[in-house]
């Protein structure tokens, strides 16, 4: 084993996280996430600067940790798969919108679905922006009495309309 030997699972992991961050930020390039021996930490590089993840905003950290956690668990539970796109599963996330800039709230579900196409995401939220970013078939409303409702289409509704009609 040589220090510079590439490990395919690690390379796939880095590529996936990079793709999610590109989707979230609507970038024209793929940022990098990798372990820096020099800093002895996981770092994020946007091409201009390299920063430890702990130096990033809470929103960046939140999406990075969620993405890395999903990818790690998928790799451990499915060692025979070479692509994250092939792996089916169910992932539950509570309050995905926590710490996220409104633009990132809008992009979050799409970015996850694009990068994990065979994963069913069950996401609990109170964010009207996150709700407005969903297509109708993705929404289920459960009230305090556990009554289940399938609200009308909320895609691209204003925040006020989502609060009034959906929540």
Predicted regions and their residues:
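Walker B catalytic acidic pair
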Residues: 94-95
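Short active-site loops of ABC-family nucleotide-binding domains
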Residues: 98-99
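C-terminal lobe/lid and adjacent interdomain/linker elements of RecA-like ASCE P-loop ATPase modules
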Residues: 106-167
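Extended helical coiled-coil dimerization/tether regions that scaffold
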Residues: 1-61, 65-86
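Helix N-cap at the start of a conserved alpha-helix in ABC-type nucleotide-binding domains
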Residues: 102-103
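Hydrophobic "anchor" residues on beta-strands that sit immediately upstream
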Residues: 90-91
